[in-house]
Amino acid sequence: MSESKKPLNHLAIIMDGNGRWAKKRHLPRFVGHRHGMDNIRNIALAANKLGIKVLTLYAFSTENWARPTDEVNYLMRLPIDFFDKFMPELMENNVRVNIMGFVDELPEKTYLVTQKAMAETANNTGMVLNFAFNYGSRREITAGVQEIARKVKVGEIDIDDISEKMVSDHLLTHSLAPYEDPDLLIRTSGEERLSNFLLWQMAYTEFSFSDKLWPDFDKTDLEELVKDYQGRNRRFGKV
């Protein structure tokens, strides 16, 4: 198999455009978030059928706390509704749930439902549905570096032992090994920026940007972008 035809092991998606989707329809923003939540189910099942091993979804950033309180409170309820509604299908499709972020800062009910989802799917061996929730890449890297520094301070490791792999092993994605780094990033809604998402892990990631708003992004859109990715020549800095 040629380099360009290798499977897409880790797909990351910045799910953007829920608010604009609602605004275009003269609806409250929370309606867009609700439709966006339902679309997670559609895209997750489609990605699973494509053989993707890890699907990482940027669900809530550490910066999103600055949104209006009513909106934040609604977003904190969505994981409860999502797993209540779709857990049977996740189990049926052998999907394992992982929550990646500073989850100890979540409201108790939200935290408990995420931990329950991980526990209930822990023995599933199919695709990992990895939610980045209360996640920020700069904070993740800072926390990882601080932990390495503590180990150096107490003599657990030598400063010369610090390597790229060691840094990776101290990031929140280490549990996704050997697929910590996304092969492809998709961002919906036409925006073309990373928004503090997986900055270390995406050093060699391919990017695709869709003009579709997240609630409208469907299976066909996903398949087209995956096909485009599979036709690319990933050189990783080589000729």
Swiss-Prot record:
Gene3D superfamilies assigned: Decaprenyl diphosphate synthase-like
Keyword Transferase: yes
Signal peptide limits: none
One Gene Ontology CC term in the entry: cytosol
Keyword Metal-binding among record annotations: yes
One Pfam family here: Prenyltransf
EC number: 2.5.1.-
Cofactor: Mg(2+)
List of residues binding Mg(2+): 16, 206
Cofactor note: Binds 2 magnesium ions per subunit.
Annotated binding of substrate, by residue: 17-21, 29, 33, 61-63, 65, 67, 187, 193-195
Keywords: Magnesium, Metal-binding, Transferase
GO process terms (BP): polyprenol biosynthetic process
Active-site annotation: 16, 64
Example GO molecular function: magnesium ion binding
Superkingdom as given in the UniProt entry: Bacteria
Summary of subunit composition and partner proteins: Homodimer.
Function of the molecule: Catalyzes the condensation of isopentenyl diphosphate (IPP) with allylic pyrophosphates generating different type of terpenoids.
Family statement: Belongs to the UPP synthase family.
Protein name: Isoprenyl transferase
Lineage of origin: Bacteria, Bacillati, Bacillota, Bacilli, Lactobacillales
Gene (UniProt): uppS
